[in-house]
Swiss-Prot record:
Protein origin, superkingdom: Eukaryota
EC number, UniProt record: 4.2.3.-
Gene Ontology annotations of biological process type: terpenoid biosynthetic process
GO molecular function, one term: lyase activity
Membrane topology type: Multi-pass membrane protein
Gene source species: Gibberella zeae (strain ATCC MYA-4620 / CBS 123657 / FGSC 9075 / NRRL 31084 / PH-1) (Wheat head blight fungus)
Pathway: Secondary metabolite biosynthesis; terpenoid biosynthesis
Protein name in UniProt: Terpene cyclase dpfgB
Location in or out of the cell: Membrane
Gene Ontology CC terms, in alphabetical order: membrane
Pfam families: Pyr4-TMTC
Family under the similarity heading: Belongs to the paxB family.
Reported function: Terpene cyclase; part of the gene cluster that mediates the biosynthesis of diterpenoid pyrones. The first step of the pathway is the synthesis of the alpha-pyrone moiety by the polyketide synthase dpfgA via condensation of one acetyl-CoA starter unit with 3 malonyl-CoA units and 2 methylations. The alpha-pyrone is then combined with geranylgeranyl pyrophosphate (GGPP) formed by the GGPP synthase dpfgD through the action of the prenyltransferase dpfgC to yield a linear alpha-pyrone diterpenoid.
Keyword annotations: Lyase, Membrane, Transmembrane, Transmembrane helix
Amino acid sequence: MEVADPSRAPPEYKDVAWIADTCKLLMGIGWTTNYVGMIYKSLKDETYAMALMALCCNFAWELTYALIYPFGSDLEMYVHFSGLMLNCGVMYTAVKNAHREWGHSPLVLRNLPLIFIICVSGFMSGHVALAAQVGPSLAQAWSAYGCQLLLSVGGLCQLLCRGHSRGASYFLWFSRFFGSLVLVPQDILRYKYWRVDHEYMGSPLYIWFVCIFLLLDGSYGICLWYVRRFERQTAVAHKKKK
């Protein structure tokens, strides 16, 4: 869903619209690849790849803008419902394997189904409330930024708290990072050539969001390298003891 009607775009933006559209296509490829990769990795490692809160928030966003505020064009609806179907697969692997990661917390372990239901419902109510407040076109963009930050924070915290790399890989990290990063050039083009409807993209809050996203997701790759190295060192030490 576009924040502004493309038919209202000024001529100078239409000249570079193909670049923005290419960025959007690459975003779709990156995230589709990431969803498929997460499903495969989760089934293979018998765990879940995306942090639970981030997953519930993202899944609630998909539900909100597929069922309550569906995308306008046929192409947008197809792309969005395809993403929703893949996200259902990601959610399935999380529901199936979450108990394997919460043995240290009996309270969470015993209430995982309830936690999933409450979190998805709660986040969905927030997305709907924001859409009612500022309008669905603007809300879907703003709430997507919130989903991205929660995903970045949750993924990094999950990696550090687990202390292992099951459910994680450089491929998953890069496809997610690339899929979100490629939208930054699109936003720059919109702010430069179509500023009247995209003024917020030059705001301090948006600039802060981009910087925090780069910091968190960039740190994830570094932390994953350290975790992998620790796992290798531990495996070598264990073999020497034998």
